[in-house]
């Protein structure tokens, strides 16, 4: 966690504006995260946000949040995938196993993902994240070791389905990574990568019943599985998450502010 009380000692925006005509902030984590700070730190962060010339946010709902909070220009910052540049091997074969998107804490919604993943009657795997808790290894989940992103992407391509019932909406990289490989992913609405790339597999927050229904449909209906697989890959190719589409989008934003 950022040591915010140390930042309070500096005129951060003033110092930055000595170096640049425009100062821009990019969201990291959920938009409500600063509200877990001490009261004086919350006020400091709010005042700091209002001093930026422009903000970038993860999701459409985050754009609305920061626009309302700051009255500053806010744009969506898509997570850019540089898979080809980094040597990611596209999916060409896969096994009968499920990948859930996080550990057993509220932040990741790992327990909800585990419940939904059980519907497939397949081995369940999970990445090891920073919030992994004691005794997780005692569950019938195979935890992968900590990996670089390239190692993660080349490992992910072998899995049948992704399940990511994460209530904390931020950059949405798990669902995005799945879409790159054409892996159907069940998850919550409100996360742009989920809604945009896996529209047939997006459910309302907390709707485990619908998520389990979709899991069984993917399991039993091969045509539905193939539709979800091809759809997410096709939507990824058309999205702002690819370098081809991202570059003109972000260039236009910067040209307008400079």
Q: Where do the protein language model's features map onto the residues?
A:
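A charged, aromatic-enriched C-terminal amphipathic alpha-helix characteristic of glycosyltransferases
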Residues: 220-256
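Conserved catalytic-core segment of nucleotide-activated headgroup transferases in glycan assembly
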Residues: 83-137, 143-149
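Short alpha-helical segment that forms part of, or immediately flanks, the ligand-binding pocket
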Residues: 153, 175-181, 194
């Amino acid at each position: 966690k950022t040591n915010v009380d140390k930042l309070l000692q500096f005129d951060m925006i003033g110092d930055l504006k000595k170096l640049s005509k425009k100062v821009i902030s990019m969201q990291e984590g959920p938009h409500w995260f600063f509200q877990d700070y001490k009261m004086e730190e919350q006020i400091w962060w709010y005042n700091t946000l209002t001093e930026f010339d422009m903000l970038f946010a993860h999701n459409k709902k985050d754009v609305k949040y920061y626009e309302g909070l700051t009255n500053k220009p806010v744009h969506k910052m898509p997570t850019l995938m540089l898979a080809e540049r980094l040597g990611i091997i596209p999916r060409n074969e896969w096994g009968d196993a499920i990948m859930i998107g996080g550990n057993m804490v509220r932040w990741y919604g790992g327990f909800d993902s585990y419940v939904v993943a059980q519907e497939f009657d397949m081995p369940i795997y999970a990445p090891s994240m920073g919030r992994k808790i004691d005794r997780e290894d005692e569950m019938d989940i195979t935890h992968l070791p900590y990996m670089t992103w390239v190692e993660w992407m080349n490992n992910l391509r072998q899995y049948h389905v992704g399940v990511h019932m994460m209530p904390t909406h931020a950059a949405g990289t798990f669902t995005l990574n799945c879409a790159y490989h054409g892996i159907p992913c069940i998850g919550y609405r409100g996360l742009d990568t989920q809604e945009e790339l896996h529209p047939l597999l997006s459910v309302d927050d907390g709707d485990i019943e619908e998520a389990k229904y979709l899991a069984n449909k993917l399991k039993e209906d091969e045509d539905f599985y193939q539709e979800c697989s091809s759809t997410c890959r096709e939507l990824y190719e058309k999205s702002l998450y690819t370098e081809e589409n991202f570059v003109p989008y972000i260039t236009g934003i910067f040209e307008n502010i400079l």
